[in-house]
Amino acid sequence: VLFEYEILEKESICYLQFNQFADRMTHPNHPELPRFDFVLIDMMKEIEEKNIGTLVVDLQYNGGGNSALGKLLMSWLHPFDKTNWTDVDVRVSDLLCELYPKYRDYTINEKPLEIGKVYDMFSFDQTKPNMDYKIPEGYVQDTSNYMLNLDVDKIYKGNVVFIESRGSLSSSEMLLTTARDNGVGIIVGETSGANPCNYGDILYSILPNTSIRVGTSCKFFTRVNKDLLHEEYLVPDVIVELDDPEKDLVWEWILENYGK
């Protein structure tokens, strides 16, 4: 299961099991997969209808994927235009354009990108969001673009609890770091297994003489809070053991502190 949610009305908790940053949009050859943005729209509507007081986002088994899904979730938890996003620098190369042809069409101020240069990922004309966009009541299931929540009136106003483990890596850790640096919710669980600032998005190729498959990072991710760049790991607000064989200690903590 990539992701699924459950509403616990008695405890006034919505539990979102978020196992991988992947869906139908990131894997277009698998139309049977759900779309994360559609699931979020349904989830938030049900949360509002049932007046749920706490959203728990479980990332302890999430090793990453496409960071766009983290941006989708954050758009429901914090005003999009006031969110400070992780800085993403990307080096444009022939290999990048070969593997991701969209970069051939990307522009900055209507000028094409130059091979070999490093760019701010969010400075491209094509990656700037339309801040006038509102999610329609009856969203179209065959839309070709992700549906961000840009309506501040729909921002979730309850408690938000993220569960982190040593295995919460890559895009998962980026989401946790973005939430922390924007003051969204609290993090419980284990200290992260990687640096909040890191290289990512690996491009794979085959060496012509040896046929060895190699990978090269094309992006560097820098956290929002520059005062914390020295931190080697993301330490949770509340440290809770996750591998107790007898008890689910983190869930017990959540019920004790947020369950009705």
Residue ranges and their predicted role:
Residues 1-260:
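C-terminal "post-core" interaction segments
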